[in-house]
């Protein structure tokens, strides 16, 4: 690759790293093209992005982004990157689901290597725990449901009292 092209790629990666709430590092070797296409589509739908870049260029981009943690042990071999822009859980969830399916099929391919979440390096275990969390929308709906529960009960109680008074007045 020409030096200018590499500089442009690094600049692009720096922008993505700064914009992302989370980045998941994946060993993508052995994944089928149709599975990768489906993963990319799923990521786009959830405000995330999946791409493959050279490890050396990604290391340079991390340094230029101001990331102080070392990712040398993670950035070895075939590495793909899943960036989460809107929801930090989305890329972890999508990648984890595919990795879990591959492990269930007893295939030793497509493994999570680690991640980067809001300024700090995270382990494989932490990425898996993040993937098990509900999405932001699910959390908001759970919160709203718990807030509306008491109001709903109060409304039912007042209707029941009104019906009871109406029944005794007749």
Curated annotation (Swiss-Prot):
Keyword Ribonucleoprotein in annotation:
yes
What SUPFAM superfamilies does UniProt report for this protein, alphabetically?
Ribosomal protein L10-like
Q: Does the keyword rRNA-binding apply?
A: yes
Keywords attached to this Swiss-Prot or TrEMBL record, sorted alphabetically, are: Ribonucleoprotein, Ribosomal protein, RNA-binding, rRNA-binding
Q: Which GO terms describe its molecular function?
A: large ribosomal subunit rRNA binding; structural constituent of ribosome
Q: Name one GO biological process term.
A: translation
Kindly give the InterPro entries that the UniProt entry links to this protein: Ribosomal_uL10, Ribosomal_uL10-like_sf, Ribosomal_uL10_bac, Ribosomal_uL10_bac_type
What cellular component GO annotations does this protein have? cytosolic large ribosomal subunit
Q: Which Pfam families does this UniProt record tie to the protein?
A: Ribosomal_L10
Oligomeric state and interaction partners are given as: Part of the ribosomal stalk of the 50S ribosomal subunit. The N-terminus interacts with L11 and the large rRNA to form the base of the stalk. The C-terminus forms an elongated spine to which L12 dimers bind in a sequential fashion forming a multimeric L10(L12)X complex.
Instruction: State what this protein does.
Output: Forms part of the ribosomal stalk, playing a central role in the interaction of the ribosome with GTP-bound translation factors.
Q: Would you identify the family this protein belongs to, as annotated?
A: Belongs to the universal ribosomal protein uL10 family.
Name the record gives this protein: Large ribosomal subunit protein uL10
Organism per entry: Fusobacterium nucleatum subsp. nucleatum (strain ATCC 25586 / DSM 15643 / BCRC 10681 / CIP 101130 / JCM 8532 / KCTC 2640 / LMG 13131 / VPI 4355)
Q: What is the lineage of its organism?
A: Bacteria, Fusobacteriati, Fusobacteriota, Fusobacteriia, Fusobacteriales
